[in-house]
Swiss-Prot record:
Cysteines paired by S-S bonds: C45-C51, C47-C189
UniProt xrefs under InterPro entries: PLC-like_Pdiesterase_TIM-brl
Catalytic residues as annotated in Swiss-Prot or TrEMBL: H5, H41
Entry function: Dermonecrotic toxins cleave the phosphodiester linkage between the phosphate and headgroup of certain phospholipids (sphingolipid and lysolipid substrates), forming an alcohol (often choline) and a cyclic phosphate. This toxin acts on sphingomyelin (SM). It may also act on ceramide phosphoethanolamine (CPE), lysophosphatidylcholine (LPC) and lysophosphatidylethanolamine (LPE), but not on lysophosphatidylserine (LPS), and lysophosphatidylglycerol (LPG). It acts by transphosphatidylation, releasing exclusively cyclic phosphate products as second products.
Name listed for the protein in its UniProt record: Dermonecrotic toxin LspiSicTox-betaIII2
Chain sites annotated for binding Mg(2+): E25, D27, D85
Length: 274
């Protein structure tokens, strides 16, 4: 998965898709009532990017619905994954639960269109901390309450705060969620060691538990040598400000036999066996 980073404006969806992204990541903030309000990343953000651009969340969601709905004039076939970077680390457990319920309602109304020709992309909920795990519980509960449990097949979870992997695995067991991605990374302004990333990859490959890690990705990787390096480690996704660079490298002689861009037919909740 080539994951376009910080795609918080409508026009950037097209910009990053044109550069080769088959997934986009956007930031989501919450108001004082724990309801999703904007696609916004405050200062600081990645080097070389402009912080602070935003859209009203529901308007942005409607826009990407059109981009991922077959038959719509704006449909982009290659755009198959939406990742939400949830800016909610300050919320309590009960507040996280309420935020999850609100998010499910917004997806039903503005993305899935309550079953009437809505968007088809997979959804990855990136939760900043295991302390906010009840967000996922609230999200699932709301879908079930409203009779749209089938959409759970499209939704996965990622705990994105670089926390202890054993602690994350324990929470995943309590959540009983099989659609698990695991991230590791840092802003492109800095470098980061790879020991935790390698541990996540090892767990993905060796852990056969039902609620184990299925995919591993790293962020934010922009430079050609770094992209090649991480691909060689065996990651499933690269979050980047330059999707065209990842696409270019995937077509180099080293990788075409083992790696390719994911399509809608590739299940993001299953381990890849190359």
């Amino acid at each position: 998965w080539i994951m376009g980073h910080m795609v918080n404006k409508k026009y950037q969806v097209d910009e990053f898709a044109d550069l080769g992204a088959n997934a986009i990541e956007f930031d989501v903030t919450f108001d004082s009532n724990y309801k999703a309000d904007y696609t916004y990343h405050k200062v600081p953000c990645d080097c070389g990017r402009t912080c602070g651009r935003y859209e009203v969340f529901t308007e942005f969601l409607s826009y990407v619905k059109n981009e991922t709905t077959p038959g719509h004039p704006s449909f982009r076939e290659k755009l198959v994954l939406l990742q939400l970077d949830l800016k909610m680390s300050y919320l309590t457990e009960s507040q996280s639960n309420e935020a999850g319920k609100d998010m499910a309602k917004k997806f039903l109304n503005y993305y899935w269109n309550r079953g009437s020709n809505g968007g088809r992309a997979y959804i990855l909920l990136s939760i900043p901390s295991i302390d906010n795990y009840l967000f996922l519980t609230g999200f699932k509960q709301q879908l079930k309450t409203e009779g749209f449990e089938q959409y759970l097949d499209k939704v996965g979870v990622d705990f994105s705060g670089n926390e202890d992997l054993d602690s994350i695995v324990n929470v995943l067991g309590r959540l009983e969620d099989e659609h698990v991605w695991q991230s590791d990374g840092i802003t492109n302004c800095w470098t980061r060691g790879i020991s935790r990333l390698q541990d996540a990859i090892k767990r993905r490959d060796e852990d056969e538990s039902r609620y184990g890690i299925k995919k591993v990705y790293t962020w934010t990787v922009d430079y050609y040598p770094s992209i090649r390096y991480y691909l060689r480690l065996g990651i499933d996704g690269v979050m980047t400000n330059f999707p065209n660079r990842v696409e270019y490298i995937l077509n180099e002689e080293e990788f075409p036999g083992s790696l390719r861009m994911a399509t809608i037919d590739d299940n993001p909740w299953e381990k890849y066996v190359g």
